[in-house]
């Protein structure tokens, strides 16, 4: 069986629910797979029985060298795929000929572009940022073109941000593992419960959603919000005092807590501005809603209707 190394950009304790099922369950029928994660706490590599390899954060810049030091034979891998991080991709490509493996690049979400768009929304984007973005994009395209395959979340993501990539492209959208679906729990209240999970900032324009709810002239609904941006949420809610009694702020500590809250709701919310960043991939919150059998109101765009 061919060996496959998947180098992620994620911490060992972050949510891997959309990496794990594909690379640690379904593809293991066809490949012997190792998946790497990083740790800020650990000082030495840990190799788990399930194929995970935990690498100290300090070794990030020389990951292949660190793997070899720990008796992991890189010559045994036929395929190496890097997730999101082009610095890691650059190191892997330098060793491609030496170890004779094929290289892929997985783009789950364009994080650098997201930061640029957020800076634009906050009036922090300068001409230097625009020039730097063009240079970085050119460099990234060249790196991806050295790969054997490009694995974006959607063709729209490729066309919007990496249209000059010429290598073979195979789309891998985020998905739900059918083995870990959650039951939808009917709540006892008569009100309709709406749920929003995720980031709140100026770029996402959540005040548009609040504005819509503020026009409802009855109290037969509840808007539940779980976010890691509570201060930003408080600032927004201060502009809509008539919503206070209809809003419940939730503090989900982890994904399991979040899914339990979602399962008690009637409708999920994922209404986002009509910009390329949000139109090119399905937000994780949508998959969280669907995995608990909760329907979702989302933006109308080509990606969401496909």
Per-region residue spans from a language model:
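Glycosyltransferase donor-sugar binding loop
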Residues: 40-42, 197, 222-236, 251
């Amino acid at each position: 069986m061919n060996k496959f190394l998947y180098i992620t950009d994620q911490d060992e304790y972050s949510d891997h629910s959309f990496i794990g099922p594909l690379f640690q369950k379904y593809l293991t029928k066809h490949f012997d797979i190792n998946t790497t994660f990083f740790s800020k706490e650990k000082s030495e590599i840990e190799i788990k029985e399930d194929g995970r390899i935990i690498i100290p954060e300090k070794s990030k810049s020389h990951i292949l060298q660190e793997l070899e030091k720990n008796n992991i034979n890189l010559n045994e891998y036929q395929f190496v795929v890097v997730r999101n991080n082009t610095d890691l991709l650059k190191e892997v490509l330098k060793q491609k000929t030496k170890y004779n493996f094929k290289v892929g690049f997985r783009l789950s979400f364009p994080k650098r572009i997201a930061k640029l768009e957020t800076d634009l929304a906050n009036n922090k984007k300068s001409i230097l940022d625009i020039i730097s973005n063009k240079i970085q994009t050119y460099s990234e395209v060249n790196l991806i073109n050295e790969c054997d395959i490009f694995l974006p979340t959607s063709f729209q993501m490729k066309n919007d941000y990496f249209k000059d990539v010429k290598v073979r492209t195979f789309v891998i959208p985020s998905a739900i593992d059918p083995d870990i679906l959650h039951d939808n729990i009917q709540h006892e209240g008569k009100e309709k419960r709406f749920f929003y999970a995720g980031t709140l900032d100026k770029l996402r324009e959540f005040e548009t959603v609040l504005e819509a709810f503020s026009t409802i002239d009855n109290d037969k609904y509840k808007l539940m919000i779980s976010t890691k941006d509570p201060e930003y949420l408080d600032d927004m809610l201060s502009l809509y005092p008539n919503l206070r009694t209809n809003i419940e702020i939730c503090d989900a500590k982890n994904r399991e807590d979040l899914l339990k809250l979602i399962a008690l709701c009637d409708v999920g919310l994922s209404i986002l501005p009509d910009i390329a960043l949000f139109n090119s991939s399905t937000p994780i919150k949508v998959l969280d809603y669907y995995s608990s059998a909760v329907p979702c109101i989302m933006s109308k765009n080509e990606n969401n209707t496909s």
